[in-house]
A protein has these predicted regions:
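Conserved D-loop-proximal element of ABC-family nucleotide-binding domains
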Residues: 308-309
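Walker B motif beta-strand of ABC-family P-loop ATPases
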Residues: 297-299
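Walker B catalytic acidic pair
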Residues: 301-303
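DNA major-groove recognition helices of helix-turn-helix
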Residues: 94-102, 339
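Short amphipathic alpha-helical face segments that pack within enzyme cores
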Residues: 90-93, 97, 280-282, 314
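Phosphate-coordinating catalytic segments in nucleotide- and nucleic-acid-processing enzymes
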Residues: 2-49, 99-293, 368, 378-389, ...
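Pre-Walker A-like glycine/lysine-rich segment at the N-terminus of P-loop NTPase domains
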Residues: 8, 19-96
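C-terminal lobe/lid and adjacent interdomain/linker elements of RecA-like ASCE P-loop ATPase modules
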Residues: 17-34, 314-402
Length: 402
């Protein structure tokens, strides 16, 4: 696997779609408001809206609106839940491919995940950049003629945007976009030049042997301190995590009787670390990005599979506290204890996959669409499968009939 190295958001080496990725442009702000996907991966006529209609009184999440635009409300914290293979990871990877397509203007990777290459594949994404503009980017990839290869001529992109006004909501701003005629460039490369202000951070489950998993961010002033707190919480036998000043890119995880020296992600002897402790390293890197305000869009995918529920809840609480204004977090989990956190109902989205003959379709439903009253119990709704997102366990019990 090629490893990415980043300096101020510029990719120096590697491909775009490894399991962790950071694009950092410190002066930018990026918030996703709506996404529609058709004929990519298992997403067919898929839509997820990330605005919410009215202010929540005494919300545990502060400032879920654009600074200076109190009517422009967006879902700052997005907890994605659902059974296995329901699209939680795929959704993040699809977003990352869309972001890279808009940023790098190369279509190869996004074209590689078209589900049916004989049909049109489309996506439409609405997002805010620089706290000033709402963009709508609509992309249609048409199938090539029989015997021909896909080229840039098969790709049609429309970029429209308007400046956000003082009293605008997302809905009023979008209406103005749809009513405003804007000139369209002759090819998708020129059209995408209109898009500015992209920045993001993604983290996915990685193989424990992956070098990038253990690499210390060279430009981080807080990573080692954060890692020290997290690893000592995960493993009481760890007494400290220290940066080795005499060796660039190296740090030591120490117990009273032994140490693990990690240099540039190389891990010669960490077999004694638990899976959960190893996961803590990647989590520390994302929290460092939040604390140092390196990105404003974060996608944290199942980084807590080996970590105790109470630790996961505590770290998620810290992430939410660190988000600050004009930021956005996506967090995928199977841990139903997360439902007990006092978050707005609109923070929870449930994913499910339906199979129709030979085809499958990923769908999502936001808790606030079903639970309208403040007294409605989210935990009870999930336990009673009100969102139709519970895993199918029948086949598991059928094993007993063998």
């Amino acid at each position: 696997m090629l490893i990415l190295k980043f300096v101020c958001g510029i990719i120096l080496k590697g491909d775009y779609f490894v399991k962790s990725e950071i694009i950092n442009r410190r002066v930018q702000r990026m918030i996703v408001m709506n996404i529609e996907i058709d004929n990519f991966m298992s997403f067919n006529n898929f839509a997820m809206n990330l605005s919410y209609p009215k202010k929540i009184v005494n919300s545990s999440i502060q400032n879920e609106f654009l600074t200076g635009f109190s009517n422009f409300r967006y879902k700052k914290v997005n907890i994605l839940m659902g059974a296995n293979a329901t699209g939680k990871t795929s959704f993040g990877k699809m977003l990352m491919k869309i972001f890279n397509f808009m940023d790098k203007k190369q279509y190869t990777q996004i074209a590689s995940v078209i589900a049916d290459t004989n049909k049109e594949a489309t996506f439409c994404i609405d997002f805010v950049t620089n706290l000033r503009y709402l963009f709508r980017v609509n992309t249609v990839i048409s199938p090539p003629d029989e015997g021909e290869k896909l080229t840039g001529k098969n790709i049609d992109v429309s970029v429209r945007y308007v400046e956000i006004q003082k009293k605008d909501s997302y809905e009023s701003c979008l209406k103005r976009i749809l009513e405003t005629k804007q000139e369209k460039c002759d090819n998708y490369l020129e059209e995408l030049e209109k898009v500015t202000g992209l920045s993001w951070s993604f983290a996915y489950p990685e193989d424990d042997s992956a070098v990038e998993l253990f690499r210390a961010p060279k430009d981080s002033h807080t990573f080692i301190r954060i890692l020290d707190f997290i690893l000592r919480a995960l493993d009481p036998s760890i007494v400290s995590v220290d940066r080795l000043s005499e060796v660039e890119g190296a740090y030591a995880i120490r117990t009273k009787s032994k140490s693990a020296i990690i240099q540039d992600g190389q891990t010669p002897d960490i077999g004694w670390l638990s899976s959960g402790t190893k996961s803590g390293i990647a989590i520390a890197a994302m929290i460092a990005n939040m604390l140092e305000k390196k990105c404003e869009f974060f996608y944290c995918d199942e980084k807590f599979s080996f970590i105790h529920s109470d630790i996961e809840k505590a770290l998620l609480s810290v992430m939410i506290e660190l988000l600050g204004d004009n930021t956005q977090l996506f967090f995928t989990t199977h841990n139903t204890d997360i439902l007990d956190m006092q978050l707005p109902k609109h923070s929870y989205t449930f994913m499910k996959k339906e199979v129709y003959g030979e085809n499958s379709k990923i769908e999502c439903i936001n808790a606030s669409e079903i639970l309208k009253r403040s007294t409605d119990s989210l935990k009870s709704a999930v336990e009673n499968d009100l969102f139709s997102s519970a895993p199918a366990t029948d086949l598991i019990y059928d094993i007993l009939d063998i």
